[in-house]
Design a protein with these regions (language model features):
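Substrate-binding surface in catalytic domains of secreted glycosidases
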Residues: 1-69
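Soluble non-cytosolic domains of exported or imported proteins
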Residues: 11-18, 100-107, 128
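Solvent-exposed, polar/charged alpha-helical surfaces in well-ordered, non-transmembrane soluble domains
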Residues: 18-22, 107-111, 115, 135
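Conserved, mostly hydrophobic/aromatic
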Residues: 35, 113, 121
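Aromatic/acidic polysaccharide-binding cleft in carbohydrate-active enzymes
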Residues: 36, 45-51, 124-137
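Hydrophobic, secondary-structure "cap" segments at the distal end of domains
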Residues: 58-116
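Aromatic-rich peripheral "rim/lid" segments of glycoside hydrolase catalytic domains that contact
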Residues: 112, 127-159
Length: 159
C-alpha cells in the first residue's frame, strides 16, 4: 500500500514482498538484486464522510510508532498474513490502523536475502529505523549461512 492508497494496509506485507521478488528474479540475476526494506510505517486514518470511507495515511518512523502505541495503548496482535504486528485504535470518529515494521518484521523480510541468495539489501528511509534494526541486519547480512540454517536459528521469529 502506498501513500494515496484507497485502502489501508501494510507497506510491505511479507507475502507480497516475496511474490514480487520471485517475479523480479525471472528477469534480474539474483547477484544483482538488492531487497528493499522499509524502515517506516504508515499510520492509516479511516473516516466515514457522507456514507463513504475516506482513507489517508502518514509515514512515520519506528520510534514514532512506539510513541503512538505507548500513548494510545491499542491491542497489538501478530498478523500472520503480513508478517507484522498490527494495531488499531479509535479517536473521535476516526479509526487508525498500523501495520508495524519492527525488528521481527525486518528479520522475516531480510531472511529472503538468504532464501533467494540475493546480493544484499537497501532500505528506506535512514533515520526512521530503531536501533535494534541494525542488530537484526548485522545478524542477517554479515553471517554467512543459507536459508535453512537461518530458519533453524530463528524458528521462534519465523513462527
Amino acid at each position: 500500500h502506498w501513500a494515496a492508497s484507497p485502502v489501508a494496509g501494510s507497506v510491505a506485507e511479507l507475502g507480497w514482498v516475496e511474490k514480487g521478488l520471485r517475479r523480479i528474479l525471472e528477469e534480474v540475476p539474483k547477484e544483482k538484486l538488492l531487497l528493499g526494506l522499509p524502515f517506516y510505517t504508515r499510520v492509516w486514518k479511516e473516516e466515514k464522510i457522507d456514507g463513504n470511507i475516506k482513507v489517508s495515511s502518514t509515514a512515520v518512523s519506528m520510534g514514532k510508532v512506539k510513541q503512538i502505541l505507548s500513548e494510545k495503548k491499542p491491542e497489538v496482535i501478530w498478523d500472520e498474513e503480513s508478517g507484522q504486528y498490527y494495531a488499531e485504535y479509535k479517536e473521535g470518529k476516526a479509526t487508525y490502523k498500523i501495520w508495524i515494521e519492527d525488528d521481527r518484521s525486518i528479520n522475516l523480510k531480510s531472511s529472503l536475502i538468504h532464501k533467494y541468495d540475493l546480493a544484499g539489501a537497501a532500505s528506506w528511509r535512514k533515520g526512521f529505523e530503531s536501533e535494534d534494526i541494525w542488530l537484526v541486519l548485522q545478524d542477517n547480512l554479515k553471517v554467512k549461512q543459507n536459508y535453512t540454517q537461518w530458519a533453524n536459528a530463528n524458528s521462534a521469529a519465523a513462527e
